[in-house]
């Protein structure tokens, strides 16, 4: 039966046998708790089952493991949007700090004629724009119920990496001010890394994209 036999359940807090082992201490997103949970002889009522108890091997049944995987087509654009937003906030604050330091940034002039700091900033802006457009496309397809697995993975891969690169780049451009807790740049840099990891790492996204483009199954391309 394999994956078709995997089912999802709701296990309420306080159910006997369910124990929170520990709260993780993380690099970022510290306001969002992450915990390890252990189940020891935890009895879950049948009515807590999500979906049908039958094992349905038909493609697109949307239950169990397949249903869980299908949710990524909607959640990956959301994570991409979080990364895009985090990067945008960093860029806006960095531009303000650079201008206060006397760095002129001209969006209408070639980068080779501008200062090194301005040229680097404009490169980060360019990377952000690509992530933003991919995120819009994948989200629009999800909203309109169009198949978007490839686009969702592309947006997640691009925006996740750009979010991390841009926020770190902004910390670097702002020097000691960016690295200190004086402003939010260091926090955004820490928070953004998880957006490059959860909902599927870079390696997972690239594998999914390759399978879709080449028309290969998960058993044919691992």
Predicted regions and their residues:
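Alpha-helical interface subdomain recognition
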Residues: 62, 71-222
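FAD-binding core of flavoproteins
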Residues: 1-84, 88-92, 205, 215-222
């Amino acid at each position: 039966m394999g994956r078709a036999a995997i089912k999802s359940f709701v296990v309420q807090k306080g159910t006997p046998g369910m124990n929170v082992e520990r709260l993780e201490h993380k690099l970022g997103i510290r306001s969002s708790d992450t915990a390890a949970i252990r189940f020891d002889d935890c009895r879950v009522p049948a009515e807590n089952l999500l979906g049908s108890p039958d094992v349905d091997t038909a493609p697109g049944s949307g239950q169990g493991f397949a249903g869980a995987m299908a949710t990524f087509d909607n959640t990956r654009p959301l994570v991409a949007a979080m990364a895009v937003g985090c990067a945008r906030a960093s860029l806006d604050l960095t531009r303000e700090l650079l201008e206060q330091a006397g760095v002129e940034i001209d969006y209408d002039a070639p980068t080779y004629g501008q200062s090194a700091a301005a040229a680097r900033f404009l490169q980060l802006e360019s990377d952000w724009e690509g992530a933003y457009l991919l995120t819009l496309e994948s989200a629009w397809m999800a909203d309109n119920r169009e198949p978007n697995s490839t686009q969702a993975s592309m947006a997640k891969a691009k925006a996740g990496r750009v979010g991390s690169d841009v926020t770190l780049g902004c910390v670097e451009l702002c020097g000691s001010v960016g690295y200190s807790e004086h402003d939010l740049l260091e926090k955004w840099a820490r928070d953004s890394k998880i957006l490059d990891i959860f909902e599927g790492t870079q390696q997972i996204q690239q594998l999914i994209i390759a399978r879709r483009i080449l028309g290969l199954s998960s058993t044919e391309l691992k």
